[in-house]
UniProtKB/Swiss-Prot annotation:
GO terms for biological process: regulation of transcription by RNA polymerase II. Pfam families: HSF_DNA-bind. It is found in: Nucleus. This is Heat stress transcription factor B-2b. The keyword Iron-sulfur does not apply. A motif (Nuclear localization signal) lies at residues 318-322.
Length: 390
C-alpha cells in the first residue's frame, strides 16, 4: 500500500513537472563555455596588419629599407620612398606611406626620434611574436564631444531669449532669469565668454570684410587699367590699318599715273585725251622716248639727229610758217626743231647773230604757239630760204 502511494507520488510529480513551464535548455552553459573559448582564440590571433608588419620588419632581405634597431625594441624605415613604392603594394595593396603611419598610430605605435622614421611599441619586439596578440586597436569616439558641444550650443540660445518692452529696450523675462540663476554655476562662466567669442568672431569677420573690400578695389583698378590698355591697343591697330591702306592706295595711284604718263608719251596722244596733270619740273620736259619728236613733226635730213626743246613730248623749236598768198595765219601749230646751241647751219655768223631766239608764251600744248617777234622770224626765214636776199 505504501509502495503504491509512493509510485503515485512519483507519477504525480512527473505529471506536475510535465504540466509545468519548460526549464531553460541544458546546453546553455556549454554555449557560454564555447563563447569564452572563441573569445580567447580571437585574442590569441593578432590582426593581419600587425602580422604583415612583423613579417616585413623581420625579413632580412629588406634590411636596407626597413629593419629592427640594434636591441630589437623598435624598427626603422630607412628609405620611405622605396618602402612605399616597392614593399607597401606587396603587403598592404597600397603605396601610401602616410596611411601606413596612421595605421601604426591607431595600434599604439609611437615615433621615437623626429629626424627619422623609427617606431616602437611595448609588445612589438624582435623574437617575441606571441606578444602581437596583446596589441589592440584604439577606440576612437569623436561623436561624444561633438554631441556635447551641440548640446551646449543649443542650451545657450534657450538660456538667453530676448524680449522687447514698450519703449523698445531689450530685457530678460523673470522666468528666464530664474532659469539662468537656478541652473548650475557653469552657465554664468560660459555666458560672459559668449560675447567675447562673438566679439572675436566679429573682429575676425570685420578683418575679412576689410580684406575683401581692399581686394575688390584692387580688382576694379586692374579692370580699369586693362580696359584702357585694350582701348589703346585697338586704337593703335586701327591707326596702323588705316596707314597701311592709305599707303597701298597711294602706291596704286602712283603706279597707275606713271603707266598712263608713259603710254601717252610713247604713243604721241594729245593732251586733250589724257587727264590734265600738274605741271612737271623743268627736267621732266624732256621726252621719255626718243621717237616722240619725230612722231610729232617731221624734220629735215640735216636736222634729224639734233636735239630740240620739247614741252609735254611735243617739239617747240620750229617757227611758224606763212602761206604764199599772205593770207590769214594758220591756226595749226607748225614748228621745226631748233638746235640747242642756237647756231644755224648753212649761213654765216652775222646772220646767226641777227637771229633772235624765239620767245613763247606758256600756253597749253593743244593751242597754236605764236611768236612775239614773228616779223624777225619771217625775215630770218626768208633769208634762210633765199627769197628776200638783197
Amino acid at each position: 500500500m505504501a509502495d503504491q502511494t509512493a509510485a503515485a507520488v512519483v507519477v504525480g510529480g512527473g505529471a506536475a513537472a510535465t504540466m509545468g513551464e519548460p526549464s531553460p535548455p541544458p546546453p546553455a552553459p556549454a554555449a557560454e563555455a564555447a563563447g569564452v573559448g572563441v573569445g580567447q582564440q580571437q585574442r590569441t590571433v593578432p590582426t593581419p596588419f600587425l602580422t604583415k608588419t612583423y613579417q616585413l620588419v623581420d625579413d632580412p632581405a629588406v634590411d636596407d629599407v626597413i629593419s629592427w634597431n640594434d636591441d630589437g625594441s623598435t624598427f626603422v624605415v630607412w628609405r620611405p620612398a622605396e618602402f612605399a613604392r616597392d614593399l607597401l603594394p606587396k603587403y598592404f595593396k597600397h603605396n601610401n606611406f602616410s596611411s601606413f603611419v596612421r595605421q601604426l598610430n591607431t595600434y599604439g605605435f609611437r615615433k621615437i626620434v623626429p629626424d627619422r622614421w623609427e617606431f616602437a611599441n611595448d609588445c612589438f619586439r624582435r623574437g617575441e611574436r606571441r606578444l602581437l596578440c596583446e596589441i589592440h586597436r584604439r577606440k576612437v569616439t569623436p561623436p561624444a564631444p561633438a554631441a556635447t558641444t551641440a548640446a551646449v550650443a543649443a542650451a545657450i540660445p534657450m538660456a538667453l531669449p530676448v524680449t522687447t518692452t514698450r519703449d523698445g529696450s531689450p530685457v530678460l523675462s523673470g522666468e528666464e532669469q530664474v532659469i539662468s540663476s537656478s541652473s548650475s554655476p557653469e552657465p554664468p562662466l560660459v555666458l560672459p565668454q559668449a560675447p567675447s567669442g562673438s566679439g572675436s568672431g566679429g573682429v575676425a569677420s570685420g578683418d575679412v570684410g576689410d580684406e575683401n573690400e581692399r581686394l575688390r578695389r584692387e580688382n576694379a583698378q586692374l579692370a580699369r587699367e586693362l580696359s584702357q590698355m585694350r582701348k589703346l591697343c585697338n586704337n593703335i591697330l586701327l591707326l596702323m590699318s588705316k596707314y597701311a591702306s592709305t599707303q597701298q592706295l597711294d602706291a596704286a595711284n602712283a603706279s597707275s599715273a606713271a603707266g598712263n604718263n608713259n603710254n601717252n608719251n610713247c604713243s604721241g596722244e594729245s593732251a586733250e585725251a589724257a587727264t590734265p596733270l600738274p605741271l612737271p619740273a623743268v627736267l621732266d620736259l624732256m621726252p621719255s622716248c626718243p621717237g616722240a619728236a619725230s612722231a610729232a613733226a617731221p624734220v629735215s635730213d640735216n636736222e634729224e639727229g639734233m636735239m630740240s626743246a620739247k614741252l609735254f613730248g611735243v617739239s617747240i623749236g620750229r617757227k611758224r610758217m606763212r602761206h604764199d598768198g599772205g593770207g590769214d595765219d594758220d591756226h595749226a601749230a607748225t614748228v621745226k626743231a631748233e638746235p640747242m646751241d642756237g647756231r644755224p647751219h648753212g649761213k654765216d655768223e652775222q646772220s646767226a647773230e641777227t637771229q633772235a631766239w624765239p620767245i613763247y608764251r606758256p600756253r597749253p600744248v593743244y593751242q597754236p604757239i605764236r611768236a612775239c617777234n614773228g616779223y624777225e622770224y619771217d625775215r630770218a626765214g626768208s633769208d634762210q630760204d633765199g627769197s628776200n636776199s638783197t
